[in-house]
């Protein structure tokens, strides 16, 4: 047995496998039972995820994985509540415009969510500050 658990190598290996298998993408048509898991969409308004974000996302992820492992077709989407005061206030704090800061913050949050290993169907990602969201 190894003296030290190399979590970075092990987690990277499994996350790459999940990505290659497109494990968390919802099947469009299937006879499997359906399950829908939804978290609140985070405000892209800070330097990164907090423990509070994890406290909210991990239980939903556990429920979705459990259903997936038990044969359900799981829809677990995510997105960004990026149109409002939190995003605007963060942009003001940074001396910038939300059109510039929101994509940067979203990229950071998304990278961190992937590091945590949350199983979102990223093909269904939405952003409330995008014009297409309102069509």
Protein language model annotation of sequence segments:
Residues 1-135:
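N-terminal, positively charged nucleic-acid-binding surface of large information/translation enzymes
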């Amino acid at each position: 047995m190894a003296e030290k658990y190399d979590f970075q190598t092990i987690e990277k290996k499994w996350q790459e496998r999940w990505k290659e298998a497109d494990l968390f993408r919802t099947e469009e048509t299937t006879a499997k039972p359906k399950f829908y898991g939804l978290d609140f969409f985070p405000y892209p308004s800070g330097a990164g995820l907090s423990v509070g974000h994890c406290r909210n996302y991990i239980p939903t992820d556990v429920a979705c994985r459990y259903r997936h492992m038990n044969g359900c077709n799981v829809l677990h989407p995510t997105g960004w509540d990026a149109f409002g005061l939190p995003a605007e206030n963060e942009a003001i704090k940074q001396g910038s415009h939300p059109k510039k800061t929101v994509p940067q913050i979203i990229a950071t949050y998304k990278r961190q969510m992937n590091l945590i290993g949350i199983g979102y169907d990223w093909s269904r990602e939405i952003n409330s500050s995008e014009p297409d969201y309102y069509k």
